[in-house]
């Protein structure tokens, strides 16, 4: 059992199925990753699945997540625009690292 992951999994069960943007935070509360989702509950819970199938960089990010916040949007397009704006504003560590893999 991992109390940190148990907490994150439990918190995802309370998420909405609406589109939105999520902000993964490290132990100090710093934003380390920003992502968008058409279904916040499904997307965020996929990071904390009991049998994850993550790339090494995503696994590294998940290992450093201690909490997350989210913002509900009216549409996927609004989530995309907000995600882009927030990434430019915060320059989260893992958005930059994961971008390198997308060539």
Q: Across the structure, where does each feature detected by a protein language model lie?
A:
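Acidic, glycine-enriched active-site microenvironments
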Residues: 1-103
């Amino acid at each position: 059992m991992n109390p940190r992951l148990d907490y994150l999994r439990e918190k995802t069960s309370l998420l909405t199925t609406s589109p939105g943007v999520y902000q993964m935070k490290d132990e100090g509360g710093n934003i380390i990753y920003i992502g968008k989702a058409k279904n916040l509950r499904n997307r965020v819970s996929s990071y904390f699945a009991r049998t994850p199938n993550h790339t090494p960089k995503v696994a590294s990010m998940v290992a450093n997540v201690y909490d997350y916040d989210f913002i509900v949007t009216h549409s996927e397009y609004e989530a995309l625009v907000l995600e882009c704006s927030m990434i430019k504003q915060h320059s989260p560590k893992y958005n930059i690292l994961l971008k390198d893999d997308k060539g």
